Amino acid sequence: QKHGLTDYRSVILYELLLHTRLTQKQIVERTNLPKQSINKGILQLRDEGYLTLEQDEKDNRVKYCFLTEEGEEYARVKIQPLLDIEEKIIMKMGKKKIEQLNELLEEWNLNFKKYKDEE
């Protein structure tokens, strides 16, 4: 919120800055945020001219999100300070610990999804 963005808008910008082209479903899976929040953020960013949606050629139900040129610039200004902090943390903790952390988080997410789906 310090950078003038809601959490869900921040993660959308962050993910698209790093991955260029993602579907709403992929953003939801990567962030574990509610689909409604991600959808709201995508529509807001689209309406502000920062993001475009493009339908998949093979499946009309699938839409890819892309940052516009203005959106990339906006994302860099808003997200770069967070990327800089990430880089400092990686340097302090070391690559091995970060890899372990990512493996543990992935395991946690898989188990969470499994138990959630069982309910």
Predicted regions and their residues:
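Short acidic DE-rich linear segments
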Residues: K97-E99, K113-E119
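Charged, amphipathic alpha-helical coiled-coil/dimerization segments
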Residues: L43-E106
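N-terminal helix-turn-helix DNA-binding core of bacterial DNA-binding proteins
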Residues: Q1-S37
